[in-house]
């Protein structure tokens, strides 16, 4: 293997080991502007794209301890390394693909050390992102507290209303008893 390919292979191995998740994509008809736009969108959320030859990818995966299905790897291949929130980055990949007439096809991916097919990766992309899950969790925690607070406020308001009525009744009684005498 030539020195350039060795360096590329080592770079791929380093990224496979550094990133907890990645997606293997096939692209066709992707222009330079579209590729730059894709890289920019992924860069905003901590992702990275690496275009790689099939042989280099297979050797790098083997050296990194991964077994990839060779039969699904056809055409131009790229790796999308997903940042801290792999679901959000995967959503970005599928959104980009759908907006541009599916010029990117996801062949598979790795999440938390597990290899998934393209269909499974698409299903994972439909899950809520970490931020969405945090918001759902906090709203789940907040709802009972908000309801409890509303009940306590209603009780305090009713106690205040009762005391106000009692004080009004107390101030009216001396006038009534004075008029009877």
UniProtKB/Swiss-Prot annotation:
HAMAP family to which the protein is assigned, alphabetical: Ribosomal_uL10
Coiled-coil ranges from the UniProt annotation: none
Single GO BP term: translation
Keyword field: Ribonucleoprotein, Ribosomal protein, RNA-binding, rRNA-binding
PANTHER family: 39S RIBOSOMAL PROTEIN L10, MITOCHONDRIAL
InterPro entries according to UniProt: Ribosomal_uL10, Ribosomal_uL10-like_sf, Ribosomal_uL10_bac, Ribosomal_uL10_bac_type
Pfam families: Ribosomal_L10 (PF00466)
Cellular component terms (Gene Ontology): ribonucleoprotein complex; ribosome
Signal peptide: none
Family (UniProt): Belongs to the universal ribosomal protein uL10 family.
Domain of life, source organism: Bacteria
Function: Forms part of the ribosomal stalk, playing a central role in the interaction of the ribosome with GTP-bound translation factors.
Name the UniProt record assigns to this protein: Large ribosomal subunit protein uL10
GO molecular function: large ribosomal subunit rRNA binding
Complex and partners: Part of the ribosomal stalk of the 50S ribosomal subunit. The N-terminus interacts with L11 and the large rRNA to form the base of the stalk. The C-terminus forms an elongated spine to which L12 dimers bind in a sequential fashion forming a multimeric L10(L12)X complex.
């Amino acid at each position: 293997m030539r020195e350039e390919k060795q360096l590329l292979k080592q770079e791929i191995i380093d990224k496979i080991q550094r990133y907890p998740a990645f997606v293997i994509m096939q692209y066709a008809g992707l222009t330079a502007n579209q590729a730059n736009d894709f890289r920019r969108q992924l860069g905003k959320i901590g992702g990275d794209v690496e275009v790689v030859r099939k042989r280099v990818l297979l050797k790098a995966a083997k050296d990194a301890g991964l077994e990839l299905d060779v039969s699904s790897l056809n055409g131009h291949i790229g790796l999308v390394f997903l940042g801290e929130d792999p679901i959000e980055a995967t959503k970005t990949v599928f959104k980009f693909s759908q907006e541009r007439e599916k010029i990117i096809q996801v062949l598979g991916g790795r999440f938390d050390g597990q290899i998934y097919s393209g269909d499974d990766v698409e299903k994972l992309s439909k899950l809520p992102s970490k931020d969405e899950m945090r918001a759902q969790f906090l709203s789940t925690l907040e709802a009972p507290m908000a309801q409890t607070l509303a009940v306590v406020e209603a009780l305090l308001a009713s106690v205040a209303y009762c005391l106000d009525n009692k004080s009004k009744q107390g101030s009216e009684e001396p006038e009534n008893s004075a008029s009877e005498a």
